[in-house]
């Protein structure tokens, strides 16, 4: 009985199986890396957009603090409301300030900054593999006068088409990946 022929058949059967496992491992690794990169890009864009809002929020609070500091304070009759701590920025804001934080000029600036940071992280909407880049600010249902809403949120959603090796052998050479990043800032 010759074993050489049996070994050759076993090797011939195992090589395609081994190559299939290798292709699956390479595809899974590539998808994992692309998805993580997309997630980091979405989160960086959301953080950049909310930083514009935070900067404007501080500007509004400092203006209000300056007004309070320059106003003479005689002893008024009745009870007084406590002055907020200087570091508690959101306590200095009123509903008009909260409305200014979601007005069109600031909304446009926040969205533009989020898009800029998405582009800096490799997500350029003009690239054909970027299927979708959506920025939602403020969150749905936000009302500046509603005291039950404690935070302003920005949500960045990205969808990118990526190439896969094994799926190409099976007829599908692309896969769509989605990621979302959300940042928020307290406003009450």
Please give the residue ranges for each predicted region.
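Glycine-centered recognition micro-motifs in short, flexible terminal segments and loops
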Residues: 1-16
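Charged/polar positions on well-ordered alpha helices
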Residues: 7, 44-51, 116, 120, ...
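C-terminal juxtamembrane segment of a hydrophobic transmembrane alpha-helix
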Residues: 15-32
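N-terminal alpha-helical signal peptides/signal-anchor transmembrane segments
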Residues: 28, 32, 41, 45-57
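Juxtamembrane extracytosolic/periplasmic "stalk" immediately C-terminal to the first targeting helix
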Residues: 37-44, 66
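Short, conserved structural patches
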Residues: 55-188
């Amino acid at each position: 009985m010759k074993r050489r022929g049996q070994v050759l058949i076993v090797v011939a059967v195992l090589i395609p199986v081994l190559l299939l496992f290798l292709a699956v491992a390479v595809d899974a690794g590539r998808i994992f890396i692309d998805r993580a990169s997309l997630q980091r890009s979405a989160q960086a864009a959301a953080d950049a957009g909310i930083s514009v809002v935070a900067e404007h929020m501080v500007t509004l609070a400092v203006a209000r603090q300056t007004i309070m500091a320059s106003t003479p304070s005689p002893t008024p009759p009745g009870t007084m409301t406590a002055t907020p701590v200087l570091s508690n920025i959101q306590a200095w804001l009123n509903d008009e300030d909260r409305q200014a934080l979601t007005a069109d000029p600031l909304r446009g600036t926040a969205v533009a900054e989020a898009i800029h940071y998405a582009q800096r992280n490799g997500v350029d909407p003009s690239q054909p593999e970027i299927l979708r880049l959506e920025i939602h600010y403020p969150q749905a249902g936000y009302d500046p006068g509603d005291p039950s809403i404690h935070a302003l949120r920005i949500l960045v959603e990205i969808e990118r088409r990526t190439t896969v090796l094994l799926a190409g052998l099976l007829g599908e050479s692309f896969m769509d990946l989605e990621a979302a990043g959300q940042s928020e800032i307290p406003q009450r």
